[in-house]
């Protein structure tokens, strides 16, 4: 590829990263400064404290985003992929020398993933509300319309998800680029009028601000953390855009624009303290307010879209890793496999977001709910990164501590500060995360118990089919594919077929699908074929947690290993377990009941593995756990 085309590709990816990766953190100026100096924090609104607060925001962006994420954590990729799931797999594989340590690391990662859903609810709610609240600055008469308009925008956003984002997605980058340009221009205009705010670039002013607050510092930091929300997207979307475009976008445009706008708002408040009612929109001349509201609403919708898409991707990964039951996945783009739509996730998210909007009623009230889930995820990310640096990259313990200790201390400060807002709304995303964590843990444990029971009750495969080949059993043409969780025991569907139909197919494939804790499995590693006895083969299909399962396509790959399967003459036999909860088993009875409900409502195996419906025979089996 030529140097020119390389530059063009890098520019396109950098522009795309602006639209998807930086939408959330890029819309934080809408509400952060207003919350830092709200009556709830008790921070005086004067020049010294304005310079100090802006200094904390600026150096927080430098420490949390630039040093921690852009320079350190983006290096911890799992075969090019990022995100809490990929990092968890990386840390668990590197540091999981004992089963106990591996389990602890996996639980940390799963809890961090569960907390992400709390962020997925709060981000669209607070972003859209804060943008539409700009109408109140245009005229107070619009105040009563803010909530209905916000609800309408959110319903519209979730309603169009099933059509995909391939068309409007091309506009995300340019719109967000315009947004950051506007942030810069409006900020510079105020800085010129009040250049004293540039003292915020001195880190000593940040330390002095925190020192002067005493124990009250935690309350102030709990509001300042709003400037860092959305930072996890830098790492989560690394697989889509690559490390370099994300770094270039941050250092080249996003960081300067955010720093300039926060200093601009600080300069405005130094000059006119009455602007605290909505310092972001007061940066604009009256004639530009309506266009500013429209642009802000577009930017927040884009930020929300990125979080919603992230929720789909996270859920799909959790399903493939065995943390959630199967769900319907619709691919909305013929070109981009990462563009998916999950109806159940979409509507559950919409209901949760609307409850948050109506329940809290304003962006200021929602600001209290924002932060706990985000900062706890940041803390978990740093802790997992320590194990990657120490055990994955092989650095000595002092080096690993030097690379992560400061960030661990900083993240702990942010978590403690946000915890003070627990009773003001911080409980909402935390409870949501705990519920999802419980669901994930219950599903994982339930599947383990289910497979153990099946393994205990069913006969071993090889002796069974060896004896079967010696019997005179009526054989019918075609190939039968039996999907099983445990490849060493006889499939329930095979025993049902023999018992009720008293026939055996000429060719029988015992198929096991294994999902590995790596993002991708290449085609040359996708299938493993093992002949058993005449007429029987064992096939293992391997997928990563970002692959799209497609069994018919995988079976075509068996030909390279000596097994030719005519897909037009193949029947797929599936066993559907009907779970019966019993007291005194491996889980609390309420968890067994929850698992039974999830198992009963899990998505179709045929749809999940893309099996042709007219070639599928599904047989039910009652299993006690």
Curated annotation (Swiss-Prot):
One of its GO terms (molecular function) is potassium ion transmembrane transporter activity. It catalyses: K(+)(in) + H(+)(in) = K(+)(out) + H(+)(out). It is a multi-pass membrane protein. The chain crosses the membrane at residues 10-30, 47-67, 104-124, 140-160, 172-192, 214-234, 250-270, 283-303, 347-367, 369-389, 396-416, 422-442. Keywords: Cell inner membrane, Cell membrane, Ion transport, Membrane, Potassium, Potassium transport, Symport, Transmembrane, Transmembrane helix, Transport. Pfam families: K_trans, K_trans_C. The keyword Cell membrane applies. GO terms for cellular component: plasma membrane. It is found in: Cell inner membrane. The keyword Transport applies. Its main location: membrane. Belongs to the HAK/KUP transporter (TC 2.A.72) family. HAMAP family: Kup. Transport of potassium into the cell. Likely operates as a K(+):H(+) symporter. This is Probable potassium transport system protein Kup 2.
